[in-house]
């Protein structure tokens, strides 16, 4: 099984993790309105082939992005990037996205903040409990077209519009957690998981357990994964 990694805020970073490298190489795509994969080789590799490079990348990501002050993030182009990666690799697989806030940056999949406490308990409440549009449903359908499924983990501590984002399905929901970067994992899951008031120091253990269980499911036995 091959794996790959991406990180993002308002841009998307792709990583060359070819085993022959001493360090992972990062390439950034800033124009996310016309998504493409910037590298032909090294984006997806087996863990056995690239274990040392992957370990190095996992150590570097918190150092590279721990102090980021980016306030607007994307999500739609990330899903499109994963789709394009699987398409370029000519393999089916699974895209695992860890996301933590409402995608409000100018890009495909941008959403409005509909958080309005005044409508709770009124007739208008149902308007914020239904999807804003069908964009994320369309993203999911495009992925299915190339044999790519999407697992979306949400780590939010503010309004994130689950009604709209959940159209990508399946969804894992972890509330009140701040997550500053996204990574590509092999996982699966067919139900919504909500972890309210999770303590950050316990998150890694619980999330690791969840992804291991998901990976062992029959749906994760594909040849590629982000």
Regions of interest found by a model, annotated:
Residues 81-84, 92-94, 101-163, 186:
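VWA/integrin I-like adhesion module and closely mimicked acidic/polar interface patches used
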Residues 60-69, 108, 120-127, 148-154, ...:
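Short interface patches used for recognition in eukaryotic signaling and trafficking proteins
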Residues 2-4, 11, 21-26, 58, ...:
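Beta-strand-rich binding-surface signature
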Residues 130-226:
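Acidic, polar loop-rich interaction surfaces within structured domains
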Residues 18-27, 104, 109-122, 166-172, ...:
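Short secondary-structure boundary/capping segments
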Residues 1, 6, 20-22, 59, ...:
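Eukaryotic complex-assembly/interaction regions
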Residues 1-99, 127-135, 161, ...:
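Von Willebrand factor
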């Amino acid at each position: 099984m091959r794996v790959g990694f991406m990180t993002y805020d308002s841009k998307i970073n792709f990583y060359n993790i070819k085993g022959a490298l001493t360090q992972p190489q990062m390439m950034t795509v800033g124009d996310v309105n016309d998504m493409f994969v910037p590298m032909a080789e090294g984006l997806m590799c087996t863990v056995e082939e690239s274990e040392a490079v992957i370990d190095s990348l996992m150590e570097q990501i918190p150092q590279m992005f721990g102090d980021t002050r980016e306030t607007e993030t994307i999500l739609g182009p990330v899903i499109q990037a994963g789709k394009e990666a699987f398409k370029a690799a000519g393999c089916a697989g699974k895209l695992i996205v860890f996301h933590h806030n409402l995608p409000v940056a100018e890009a495909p999949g941008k959403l409005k903040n509909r958080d309005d406490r005044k409508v709770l308990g009124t007739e208008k409440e149902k308007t914020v409990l239904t999807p804003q549009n069908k964009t994320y449903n369309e993203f999911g359908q495009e992925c299915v077209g190339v044999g790519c499924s999407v697992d979306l983990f949400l780590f939010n501590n503010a309004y994130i519009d689950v009604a709209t984002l959940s159209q990508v399905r399946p969804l894992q929901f972890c509330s009140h957690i701040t997550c500053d970067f996204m990574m590509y994992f092999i996982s699966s899951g067919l139900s919504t998981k909500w972890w309210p008031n999770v303590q950050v120091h316990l998150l890694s253990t619980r999330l690791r357990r969840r992804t291991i269980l998901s990976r062992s499911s029959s749906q994760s036995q594909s040849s590629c994964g982000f």
